[in-house]
Design a protein with these regions (language model features):
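Solvent-exposed, non-transmembrane regulatory segments of membrane-associated proteins
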Residues: 4-15, 19-21, 25, 29-97
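A small-molecule sensor/coupling module
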Residues: 1
Length: 97
């Protein structure tokens, strides 16, 4: 299974990877062999993307998928890693004529 997460450019890579490894360790039903892995996979416009790989049985796929997603969010918070998201700032200029 693969899940992608993004983190701020301000977050040290090792802190992000540690948070991801904690999330993996706290997610039941992930297989130990083959081993899970976390990689820095992309430099985006406003964030860095990390790809989290793990293995589970087909019967456990959805439990692991959703459990890992929640655990990633919690681990990022515990490690003070900012999860990024796209946003748009709009400035409204008044018509002065």
């Amino acid at each position: 299974m693969t899940q992608k997460v993004t983190a701020s450019y301000d977050a040290p890579t090792e802190d992000v990877k540690a948070a991801c490894r904690d999330a993996l360790a706290n997610t039941p039903k992930i297989l130990e062999d083959p081993a899970s892995a976390v990689y820095l996979s992309n430099y985006g416009e406003s964030s860095i993307e990390y790809t989290v790989f793990c293995w589970c049985s087909a019967a456990d796929y959805w439990d692991v998928y959703f459990g890992l997603g929640e655990n990633l969010r919690n681990a990022f918070a515990a490690h003070s890693v900012e999860m990024t998201y796209d946003h748009l700032n709009v400035h409204i200029v008044e018509n002065r004529g």
